[in-house]
Amino acid sequence: MDVFSEVLSPTAAGIIEVVVPPDSNVIGQSIKELALRQSYGATVLAVFRIDQVIDRDLPEFVVQAGDTLVLHARWKNIAPIAENKDFAVVTDFPRDDT
């Protein structure tokens, strides 16, 4: 089945880490409220907070400064996330410079 072939292709999509900076407007919002899938086509896989890995009940999880969101997204959708001051993309990703 080719339905997921593009989104699962490592040349088209991948996993990135995004840190929530201390001055972010998303602090205090739940993962669901962030609407990352609707806005960027990104899926939150887990959240790292200090020494915890949160991977359950993610829609209700409330974001704090310093949280690291682990996302899966198409590479072309990551550039807009990187341009958003509410997030700091800390993973290198392929950029389309055309």
Can you describe what each PLM-predicted range is?
Residues 1-98:
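Cytosolic regulatory regions of ion transport systems
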